[in-house]
Amino acid sequence: MYDNLKSLGVNHPDDIDRYSLRQEANNDILKIYFRRDKGELFAKSVKFKYPRQRKTVVSYNAAEGYREINGISPNLRYVIDELDQICLRDQTEVDLKNKILDDLRHLESVVSNKIAEIEADLEKLTRQK
């Protein structure tokens, strides 16, 4: 699994925290950030440079004939797909944790309100006697 990342030398893909992608001249720059260990000030990262793929295509304008376009390298596209799988999985886990915590806080609020209501009813009963 994650063969493209392993071919780049990323032996522990589960340690990936996030990535960034930017374009510089005729290159795409991929930077992969790893989770920080306790006590580390900065996250470890690795940087990869991919040349942009150049294609010559027929222009829709008959006067121009052909034109050259730049695109993302197919290898980089495969690596990004794997990175998205890792990063989106982590995001889903964080979202689920936040949802559970929100549900727990809501439940705590409902229970404390119900306890207050029951105590008030008990207080009314004791005053009536």
From Swiss-Prot:
Please give the superkingdom of this protein's source. Answer: Bacteria
Pfam families from the entry? DUF3461
Which InterPro entries does UniProt cross-reference here?
UPF0325
Give the family this protein belongs to, as stated in its UniProt record. Belongs to the UPF0325 family.
Name used for this protein in its record: UPF0325 protein SG1947
Write down the species: Sodalis glossinidius (strain morsitans)
